[in-house]
Amino acid sequence: MASSTSGIFFQGDDESQSFINSHLTSSYGNSSNSAPGCGGPTGGYHNLSMVSGDMHNPVMMSVSTPGPSAGASSLVTDANSGLSGGGPHLQRSASINNESYMRLPASPMSFSSNNISISGSSVVDGSTVVQRHDPSVQLGGSSATSLPTSQTNQIPLSMARRASESFFQDPNNLTQARKKPRLDSKQDDALQQQILRQWLQRQDILQQQQQQQQQGQNPQFQILLQQQKLRQQQQYLQSLPPLQRVQLQQQQQVQQQQQLQQQHQQQQQQLQQQGMQMQLTGGPRPYENSVCARRLMQYLYHQRQRPSESSIVYWRKFVTEYFSPRAKKRWCLSHYDNVGHSALGVSPQAATDEWQCDLCGSKSGRGFEATFDVLPRLNEIKFASGVLDELLYLGVPSERRYGSGIMVLEYGKAVQESVYEHIRVVREGHLRIIFSQELKILSWEFCTRRHEELLPRRLVAPQVNQLLQVAEKCQSTIDQSGSDGIHQQDLQANSNMVMAAGRQLAKSLESHSLNDLGFSKRYVRCLQISEVVSSMKDMIDFCRDQKVGPIEALKSYPYRMKAGKPQMQEMEQLAAARGLPPDRNSLNKLMALRNSGINIPMNNMSGQGSLPGSAQAAAFALTNYQSMLMKQNHLNSDLNNTTIQQEPSRNRSASPSYQGTSPLLPGFVHSPSISGVSSHLSPQRQMPSSSYNGSTQQYHQQPPSCSSGNQTLEQQMIHQIWQQMANSNGGSGQQQQSLSGQNMMNCNTNMGRNRTDYVPAAAETPSTSNRFRGIKGLDQSQNLEGIISNTSLNFGNNGVFSNEVDESMGGYSWKS
């Protein structure tokens, strides 16, 4: 071994040692006196390295350019392994001591051409080399010492040249150099691990540099380079011991996982930035994935691949799959100039006046609409009334996506073709479909410009030929007999033949039972029924809320709507000023309270003091309260002077909370069910207030027992309705009521709930008018339920009541 500043020599037999020593002594003289302050050959051969890539061609190279020394930072693993390059590229680490020596492993590591190439760069850093301090190393009888680092560059370069020339020119030296030198040293596992770590680090650095340099190069070259690197890594792993191989593979896996995590984080950041930009802009933008167009293709495919006998069950599943529960399907016929309202006959004049197409902006009133509940029955009727297939020819799509997730698919030109057995109906227009985030249809709008009815030639040709033959026969008869010689019988026969041929032609044209719009009569009838029922929904709600029959509702509903329209507008304005949604049901409840004579403070209304509960509970309590007031009015007018003795047994069977008080209503006695109801009440509710007891004992001298709290209850009802409107907007408020307010509320609620539990006393025989008035409210509610059930049975075949009507849908938004 040589010192850290000397060249690299190999210790062989005596001849090779004497050969090297002779050249060293001839070039520099005495090793101790060859240079001032210099230790002999270690100072001059700092740029000398031996390369033995092949044993048959040993070469000693000398680099002519001065540079840093290649000492302990250079690695020679075997006499057969080569280091190409020289001094300018091999840099010495400053951390290596001048007297440090490098120990080489006993088992060499071979780097083939396919494995790794070391050219012009140091493989092992000097800081990681295990140093061994040895005062001197004997090399062929001449001592070799090390020079200080500051004096290594003072050796003249000509000496190295002469030494190399003398070495190559001597033929004896070549034969001696063919002998294989050997290096004997001990195994050092720590050094191998350090070498592996440094090699991996250098490989990562080189890989990053190459990737940065090759970003703009050919991708095929990059693929080939990656494949070559993989092969080199595999070969290198195979050459390693099993333990080191496992460790290296684990390190590579950890690095790959870290890279994947970094890429995933970068992708998430990009998506978040895009989402923030979409939320900031909020406007439509092109959506290149065409996901809505593909969804429409799926819709058409499943519609065409329907079962041969498609029932209502299949169409309900179909509509549920592709349509949102709040979906609507609209057809606009505003561009039909020769078609009036009578052609469709769907909506009343009030409804058609409010019709407006969102695509063309027309307010002609010609068009119709179907909601989610009607679509299953509508599809069944359409394909059961003669439609064999329905085709849709689409132009260039325009697909947009908004920041809220709503996607709009629009076709400026769309052709819909309905295929019947003997006719084809072709409609051309503008189609726009709005999809939700779940890719379900929210709105289907088709603005039709015109339509054509196409008949096959084979259907019309026989009748036309027959008519032509009859006309030719008539003409021949006239030619033969003249205009004056035609007999009356022949003229009548020819006329009958012409009429028969004309009727046959007209029959072939009108056998499909289509109207002027190209729709089947049964299809239009279903639309009519659904539209009528939808328009009557408000009146049905009015019947249910007011507990009146249909005939009385028909009499009073138009006047109520006409008189209540300004009040409804006032309610809507007040709700908008309070920041509440325009809930029709809640506004109708408030209108009912106001029409019944209850004073609603419109200016000082606040959400505080409202009772918790759902909108259904508020509507139920309000309905019970109204029914109770109506029933009390009838009973007060008819039974004010009637006295009924109460049975002691019934008094004893009553609830303890009501003992010692007079009956709630004259002419009626307690039912045993009162005790059952009161037993389920809370203790707080079972405590009657003093005002309640005082009022019930003096019924004949003053209004009913709970009349003193009617005003408080009215205010509570109003507050409750306002609070339910606020809760539907996302807010909630629960305020505690006072004890007197709760007792008053319980009093009225119990009266309303248990009004059917009171039975007339046996001593009283009510007259016809009393019986009618006493059970008027119950009869009206029963009649209303019967009428609604009969209506559903009558319209059941047409599929109007196939699904439950969702009150939250709000009906048609284009209606007033």
UniProtKB/Swiss-Prot annotation:
It comes from the Eukaryota. Residues 133-153, 166-189, 644-711 are annotated as: Disordered. A motif (Nuclear localization signal) lies at residues 316-330. Keywords: Developmental protein, Differentiation, Flowering, Nucleus, Transcription, Transcription regulation. Residues 139-153, 166-176, 644-662, 672-711 have a biased composition (Polar residues). It is found in: Nucleus. GO terms for biological process: cell differentiation; embryo development ending in seed dormancy; gynoecium development; negative regulation of response to salt stress; plant ovule development; regulation of response to osmotic stress; response to aluminum ion. Residues 307-554 are annotated as: Dimerization. The keyword Signal does not apply. InterPro entries: LIM-bd/SEUSS. GO terms for cellular component: nucleus. PANTHER family: LIM DOMAIN-BINDING PROTEIN (PTHR10378). Probable transcription regulator that functions in the development of the carpel margin meristem similarly to SEUSS (SEU). In association with SEU, supports organ development from meristematic regions by facilitating auxin response and thus organ initiation, and by sustaining meristematic potential through the maintenance of PHABULOSA expression. DNA-binding adapter subunit of the SEU-SLK2 transcriptional corepressor of abiotic stress (e.g. salt and osmotic stress) response genes. This is Probable transcriptional regulator SLK2. It comes from Arabidopsis thaliana. The lineage of its organism: Eukaryota, Viridiplantae, Streptophyta, Embryophyta, Tracheophyta.
